[in-house]
């Protein structure tokens, strides 16, 4: 007998029905979409079996072409065929035009100085072009998976700034697609290899794509990735290999002053030759001119290696710098993950293996590894995994910091930091003999405490009574996967510590967060001026406090005239510090410093005399 499932209208009869979500690698050269199906993560092919979609958009009088169709026409219509649009994301037109590379496109500036491509379909910006690349990927996913997507995870380079990240989100919004998370490409690659569930240690992600190079050093600790350091070059990638080979071929064929159409044709052939040299020691290049003449030349792997050697060495130099920034050595790196189609180039793999001293991970297609990691993360974020498997639940919506002298805010954890996260910073005492320190934890983007949201207060007691600035207190902010903030303050020499816990997001609506962010931008200039004033006032108070203590102890080293002169300059500084002119306060501090140079020298001489009193030459 068949059993019927009964459910309320509009509701699923299966309470744990699989939710549809995908990961999208929105790449400079190619883009991919991947999904988890029946526990297996894989990229989704189009109807022709092609997994990667060329990140190329062509605008014609009749409509818009995307992907391979656009790529086929790019040589004949370079002006209206936009490639590597990711390089334009978040950049101003001035920035683009001041670069070394010339583009065939006709540009105009938007009201805010951003680039607009002039096309037969009208003016379009990089966000709109990116949306056209996302469109067929979303359509492919919904057709393959058999339903509407409930969200996507889109990957971005680790170095992308807020404007570039927001532009990527906006591109998805134009399609009405919900972005579950923007995931850094190196983290996605590590997740794809399952490194989040393996041994703890340091992992390097070497990502050489079409237009960018990114090296990230991650530390894996209990399934959580901590980014130790990132580096790279936002204008170095496989495209540059193509351009070098293109220039070489053009020189061999003695082609001068070629038009944009032939230049694009030559570039396409250079890319084909580069890819063929991955498995061959030599490849024949050919080019058909407008008059039907066919040019041919043999390109060897040795020639190609020689052309790109300097660029590959440049990536290794970035690796060296980034390891130094991370405070680790190449020997400490457990695994090196290769990401990006350009890592297929044999010379790249050879140089990376030589530098890190071990063969890099290449078992997952380097073109697909980021999309696969994004799909795994999308599957988690949409709710298809038990909560125990959730690693990256959220990001910190507003910066977390601590109040310092003068009512200033020292930000410890910046907004948009992925959680869980831990950050530490050192502070010191303000007064001689200070044995306790009060901590005020705040949230917000403003420079002064009064303009931020108060979260918690606590006190650290038992600090050794040392001179001002001698005690070192390490303050650690930890935000766990549930968004719970723990702040711990520890005096380093004694180990004495105090801590408090708070939920930073509690009671804050999206509207309130947005308002706080808008206020920080609106008052940015005013806030910086107020901060500079407060900093000078704090410095003036510190100088006066220190000098008063010195005078109380060694004032008898001065003549009455010297003492009166110093007292007068101190009074002048105290008066100016009550005003609102930061430059005047700074100048008054410098004047006081000049007037106390002799006093400082006398104190030093006296200290030496006291230290050596009663000592013989032999004992010194």
From Swiss-Prot:
The question of whether Repeat is a record keyword is answered with no
Where does this protein have coiled-coil stretches? none
> Which InterPro entries would you find in this protein's record?
ATPase_NBD, Heat_shock_70_CS, HSP70_C_sf, HSP70_peptide-bd_sf, Hsp_70_fam, ISC_FeS_clus_asmbl_HscA
GO BP annotations, alphabetical order = iron-sulfur cluster assembly
Q: Does the keyword Membrane apply?
A: no
What are the annotated disulfide bridges?
A: none
Recorded superkingdom: Bacteria
Q: What does this protein do?
A: Chaperone involved in the maturation of iron-sulfur cluster-containing proteins. Has a low intrinsic ATPase activity which is markedly stimulated by HscB.
Q: Which family does it belong to?
A: Belongs to the heat shock protein 70 family.
UniProt-listed HAMAP family: HscA
| Record-given protein name | Chaperone protein HscA homolog
Write down the species.
Shewanella sp. (strain ANA-3)
């Amino acid at each position: 007998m068949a059993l019927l499932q009964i459910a309320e209208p509009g509701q699923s009869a299966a309470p744990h029905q699989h939710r549809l979500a995908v990961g999208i690698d929105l790449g400079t050269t190619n883009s991919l979409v991947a999904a988890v199906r029946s526990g297996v993560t894989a990229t989704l092919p189009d109807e022709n079996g092609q997994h990667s979609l060329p990140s190329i958009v062509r605008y014609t009088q009749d409509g818009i072409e995307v992907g391979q169709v656009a790529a086929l026409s790019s040589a004949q219509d370079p002006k209206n065929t936009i490639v590597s649009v990711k390089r334009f994301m978040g950049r101003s037109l001035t920035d683009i035009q001041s670069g070394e590379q010339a583009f065939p496109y006709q540009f105009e500036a938007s009201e805010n100085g951003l680039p607009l491509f002039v096309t037969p379909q009208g003016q379009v910006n990089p966000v709109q072009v990116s949306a056209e690349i996302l469109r067929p990927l979303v359509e492919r996913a919904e057709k393959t998976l058999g339903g509407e997507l409930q969200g996507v995870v889109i990957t971005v380079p680790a170095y992308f700034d807020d404007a570039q990240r927001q532009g990527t989100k906006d591109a998805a919004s134009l399609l009405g697609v919900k972005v579950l998370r923007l995931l850094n490409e190196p983290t996605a690659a590590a997740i794809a290899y399952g490194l989040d569930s393996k041994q703890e240690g340091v992992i390097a992600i070497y990502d050489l794509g079409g237009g960018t190079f990114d090296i990230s050093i991650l530390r894996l600790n209990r399934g959580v990735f901590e980014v130790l350091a990132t580096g790279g070059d936002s204008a170095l990638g496989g495209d540059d290999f193509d351009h070098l080979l293109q220039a070489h071929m053009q020189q061999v064929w003695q082609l001068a002053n070629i038009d944009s159409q032939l230049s694009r044709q030559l570039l396409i052939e250079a890319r084909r030759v580069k890819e063929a040299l991955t498995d061959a020691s030599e490849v024949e290049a050919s080019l058909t001119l407008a008059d039907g003449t066919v040019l041919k030349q043999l390109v060897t792997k040795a020639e190609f290696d020689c052309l790109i050697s300097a660029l590959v060495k440049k990536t290794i130099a970035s690796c060296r710098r980034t390891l130094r920034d991370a405070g680790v050595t190449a020997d400490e790196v457990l695994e090196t993950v290769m990401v990006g189609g350009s890592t297929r180039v044999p010379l790249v793999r050879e140089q990376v293996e030589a530098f890190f001293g071990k063969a890099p991970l290449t078992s997952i297609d380097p073109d697909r590894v980021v999309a696969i990691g994004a799909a795994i993360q999308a599957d988690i974020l949409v709710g298809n995994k038990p909560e125990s498997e959730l690693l990256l639940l959220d990001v910190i919506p507003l910066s977390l910091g601590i109040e310092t002298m003068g009512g200033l805010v020292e930000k410890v954890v910046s907004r948009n930091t992925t959680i869980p996260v831990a950050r530490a910073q050192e502070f010191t005492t303000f007064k001689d003999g200070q044995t306790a320190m009060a901590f005020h934890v705040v949230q917000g983007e403003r420079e002064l405490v009064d303009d931020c949201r108060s979260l918690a207060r606590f006190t650290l007691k038992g600090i050794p009574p040392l001179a001002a600035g001698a005690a070192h207190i390490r303050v650690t902010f930890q935000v766990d996967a549930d968004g719970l903030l723990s702040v711990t303050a520890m005096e380093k020499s004694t180990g004495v510590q105090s801590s408090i816990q708070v939920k930073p997001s509690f009671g804050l609506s999206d509207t309130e967060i947005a308002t706080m962010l808008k206020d920080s931008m609106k008052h940015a200039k005013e806030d910086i001026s107020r901060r500079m004033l407060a900093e000078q006032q704090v410095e003036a108070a510190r100088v006066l406090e220190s000098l008063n203590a010195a005078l109380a102890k060694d004032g008898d080293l001065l003549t009455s005239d010297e003492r009166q002169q110093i007292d007068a300059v101190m009074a002048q500084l105290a008066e100016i510090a009550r005003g609102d002119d930061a430059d005047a306060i700074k100048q008054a501090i410098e004047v006081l410093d000049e007037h106390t140079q002799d006093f400082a020298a006398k104190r030093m001489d006296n200290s030496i005399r006291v230290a050596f009193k009663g000592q013989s030459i032999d004992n010194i």
